[in-house]
Amino acid sequence: MKRHLNTCYRLVWNHMTGAFVVASELARARGKRGGVAVALSLAAVTSLPVLAADIVVHPGETVNGGTLANHDNQIVFGTTNGMTISTGLEYGPDNEANTGGQWVQDGGTANKTTVTSGGLQRVNPGGSVSDTVISAGGGQSLQGRAVNTTLNGGEQWMHEGAIATGTVINDKGWQVVKPGTVATDTVVNTGAEGGPDAENGDTGQFVRGDAVRTTINKNGRQIVRAEGTANTTVVYAGGDQTVHGHALDTTLNGGYQYVHNGGTASDTVVNSDGWQIVKNGGVAGNTTVNQKGRLQVDAGGTATNVTLKQGGALVTSTAATVTGINRLGAFSVVEGKADNVVLENGGRLDVLTGHTATNTRVDDGGTLDVRNGGTATTVSMGNGGVLLADSGAAVSGTRSDGKAFSIGGGQADALMLEKGSSFTLNAGDTATDTTVNGGLFTARGGTLAGTTTLNNGAILTLSGKTVNNDTLTIREGDALLQGGSLTGNGSVEKSGSGTLTVSNTTLTQKAVNLNEGTLTLNDSTVTTDVIAQRGTALKLTGSTVLNGAIDPTNVTLASGATWNIPDNATVQSVVDDLSHAGQIHFTSTRTGKFVPATLKVKNLNGQNGTISLRVRPDMAQNNADRLVIDGGRATGKTILNLVNAGNSASGLATSGKGIQVVEAINGATTEEGAFVQGNRLQAGAFNYSLNRDSDESWYLRSENAYRAEVPLYASMLTQAMDYDRIVAGSRSHQTGVNGENNSVRLSIQGGHLGHDNNGGIARGATPESSGSYGFVRLEGDLMRTEVAGMSVTAGVYGAAGHSSVDVKDDDGSRAGTVRDDAGSLGGYLNLVHTSSGLWADIVAQGTRHSMKASSDNNDFRARGWGWLGSLETGLPFSITDNLMLEPQLQYTWQGLSLDDGKDNAGYVKFGHGSAQHVRAGFRLGSHNDMTFGEGTSSRAPLRDSAKHSVSELPVNWWVQPSVIRTFSSRGDMRVGTSTAGSGMTFSPSQNGTSLDLQAGLEARVRENITLGVQAGYAHSVSGSSAEGYNGQATLNVTF
C-alpha cells in the first residue's frame, strides 16, 4: 500500500486473530502523540472482534460520498465531499478517548459532511470543513476552521485555536466556544427552552472564548461566561443574552439582555420591545434606550452614561445606581436619591423607605411607587401616569389636571388615582377629596373626607372599619366597593350608566342615592334607605341583607338575599318591577300600638321568594302589613309567611272578606297561584287561610274548621276516662278463683282503644281517635271472712300505665297525639251469698294523670285527677254439673278534672268531666272443681306440689258477652284569648252503645297458684262510645 513518506509502521499482535497486523503510527495517531495512539490501537485490537476499517485520504486525493459506520475511521489529508458519518462517539460527546469517525488533518478539507447520531467529525489544527450538517446525537470537535456548520440538534465543541464562521444552531443544538476560540456570524435559534434567563447551558451558544456578530433569534440564547466575550450581538424578540463576562455593542431588537453579578455590558442599544436587565452586581455602561425599549436596573446594579430617549423606559429603585440623560436633561439615581427621572411606557421608580426622589415626571405608562417612609417631592403626574403610595409616605406635586396634591403626616389631599394607580389609607389617617379613575384605593380603616369619587373601573377595598361622614360618589363607568366595613353619617351617590358593585361589605350610611345605572349588593350587609330614580336597577345577590326602604327602582332579589323593611324608614318602599326569589321581611322596633307597613310594587314576578307579613288576628282593623300591586301584575309564585305580631293567644273570627294582605289597585291583576300561604296562622280556636277574591286582592279568613289543637285537646278528657274505666275492670277481671284464703294478684294488660268519627267536634261528638294502652296492676286481699251467711272479701290495688292516642280532625286529617302517664290506687269489696251464690262487687278508684298533647305547631301539657266508682252484681246458675250461666249487671260512675293551661295560640280550660256507664250481660263457662289434689310429678323435688302433665291441671274457661251503654257524659273544653268574644267552648259527648265480648281461661298450676289469660273486643254500635281490643295475663297467689 502506498503511504506518505513520513509514515512509520508498527507490528501489533491481534489476540483475536492470533497474528501480527501492521498499524500506521501517524495514521492511527490522528494528530495525537504516538504513545497514546499505540495504546489506543492495542485497546482496539484486543476489544473488537475484527479490526475496524482505516481509510486514509491522501493529499491531493478527493473522495466523493460514502458512509462511516461500525467504528470505521477516515483520516483526511486530501478532500472529501458528501460523506455521512455515523460513528466515532464511542466514549461520549467531546471526549478525547474517541477514535472513530472522520478526522480532518492539517491540510485536509471536508465539504458538505452529514454527521448523524453517534457520529464524530474531528477537525484538527490546520484542517478545515464547510457546510457540515450535524443531527441530534452527533458532534464536531473543532481545532481548525469550520464554515457554515448547521447544528440540527447536534453539537460543536470548539477547542483552543478553533475558528467557526456562520454556524447555525437549531433546535437543541449546542455550540461550545471555549477559551482561545472565536465564533463569528453565529445564528442561534435555540437555547431558551428553559424560560427567560434560565441557566440551562446545554443548548444554544455557550461562550468562554470570543463570539463576534452573533444573531440570536426567537427561542435562541447566548450564555457568556465570566471568561467569555460577546461582541456586536443582535438579539431579536424571543431570544436573550445572559452575561456573566463581557458583552460589547449588543443590539436588542425585541430581545433581552441579562447582566449578572460580575458581568459587564457596554454600548448596548435597546430598541422597541428590547429589555436590558442589570442585576445585583452587574454593570452596564453607555446604554442607549430608544422608544419602547426598556432598561431595568435591579437593587445593587449599576448603569452609567445611559441615554434614555423619549418613549424609552427606565425601571429601577433608589437602591440601584443609574446616571445619564433623558429628555429633561441629566438624571441620576445614586445612594438612595433620585433626581429628574422620567417614567413612561412601562418605566418605574420605587422610592424605598428612607430614600428620596425629586423632580420626577410620571407620564403615560410610567409608575412611581413611594413606599412607607419614602419621600417624593415635585412630582408631575401626566395623563396615564401611575402613582403607588400609602398614607405613611410623603408625596407632593401636581396631578394631570394641574391641581396640587399631597400625602404626608397621615393626611392625603386631592389624590387622583388613574388606572393602575394605588393608594393605601392606613388606620387613623384621613383621605380628603380623593378621585379614583380606574385605580385602586385601599382603606385599612381611617376616614374618607370631602368627596371620594370612583370612576371607570375604580376599586375601593376596605379592610377593617372605615368612616365616611361626607360623600362617596360614582359618576362614570363601573366601580367596585369590596370588603370591610364603611360606616358613618355620609351618603353614597350613584350616577352614570355603569354599575356600582358592593361586595362582601358591611355598609351603614345615612342614604344611598341611586340616580342612574345599577347598584348590585353582593354578599353584603347594608343598613340604609335606597332612594332611587325610575329606570334604575337594584340587585341583591348572594347572601346580601338590606335593612332599609327602597323608593323607587327595579329590584331583583336572588334566592339567598334578604330585604328587611323597617317601619321607621324615612320613605315608603315603592318598587317598579320586583323579581323575587329571596326573602322580604316587615320588621319593627316600635313598642305599643301596632302600625302596619306597606310595600308598593307595580309588577311582581315571584320566583318562589317569601314575604313575611305581620298580622294581628285579634284586631278588627289596621291588622296586617300589606303588599300593594299598583296598576301592574303579580305573576309566578310568591310565598307569604304570616307572623302573629300581637298576643300569640289572640284571635277573632274574620268578617266580610277577611284580613287583607295583598291589595290590587288601579286595575292591577294577580294570577291564580301568584301567592301561597307558607305557614299556618293560628289564634284562639281558629286557623286562618289565604284566599284570592274577585277583586284580585288576597285575604286571610278564619276557617270554618277549627285548628287542629281543638279536637286534640278535647280528646284528652275522653282518653283519660277510658283508661280509668279499663283499669277498674269488672269482677271477672279481679276476683279470679274463689277460695277460702286471701290472695295476691298480678295482672298485665295491653290493648287498643279509640272512637269512631261521629261528626267530630263540630257536632259535639268525641273526636275520632285510635291508640294503644298498657298497664301493670297489683292487688291483694286484706280481709276474707263470713258474716251472716255471706262471704266478705276486701282488698286494695295499685296500677301504673301509659296510653298513646292519635287524634284526627273533623276532616280526617291528623290533629296530633296525646300521651298519658297514669298511676292508680283503688279498693274493692266483694260480697257473696253463700247459699244462692248471688254476689256484689264494689270498687272505688283514683288516678293521677300526666298528659301531653302534641301537634305540628304546639306542645301542651296538663295534669289532673280521675275518680271512679263501680257496683257490679251477678247470680250464677248451673246448667250442668260443669257448666254455669251467670247474668251480670254493672253500673259505673266516673269523673275527671284536668288543669288549665295555654299554648302559643291561646288559653285552654277544662271543665269537670264525668260519665255514667251501665253494662248488662252474662258469663257462660265451666264450673269445675279447682281443687289441686295430690301432686303427680315424676321429679322428686316437685312430687308433692306439681302435676305430671298439663292435662292434669284443674282448668275453667268462660266467655262474657255484654252491652255497654254510656250516658250523661259531660266535659267542657274552652279555648280562646283575653280578647272579648274570642273564647269558644266545646263539649264532646261520649254517649253511645257498644257491644263487648270477653273470654278467658284459668288454670291452677300449684295448690296455691292460679294463672289466667283473657282477651276481649268492644265495638261501638251507636254514638261516641269507645271500642277496641285487649289482652291480659293474671297471676293469682293465695296464702
Swiss-Prot record:
Consequence of changing residue 188 to F: In strain: ML 308-225
Phenotype upon changing residue 585 to Y: In strain: ML 308-225
Pfam families (alphabetical): AC_1, AIDA, Autotransporter, ESPR
Keyword Cytoplasm among record annotations: no
Keywords per UniProt: Cell outer membrane, Membrane, Periplasm, Secreted, Signal, Transmembrane, Transmembrane beta strand
SUPFAM superfamilies: Autotransporter (SSF103515), Pectin lyase-like (SSF51126)
Signal peptide location: 1-52
One GO term describing the cellular component: cell surface
Outcome recorded upon mutating residue 46 to K: In strain: ML 308-225
Coiled-coil portions: none
This protein's name: Antigen 43
Assembly and binders: Interaction with TamA of the translocation and assembly module (TAM) initiates insertion in the outer membrane.
UniProt-reported outcome of changing residue 1025 to I: In strain: ML 308-225
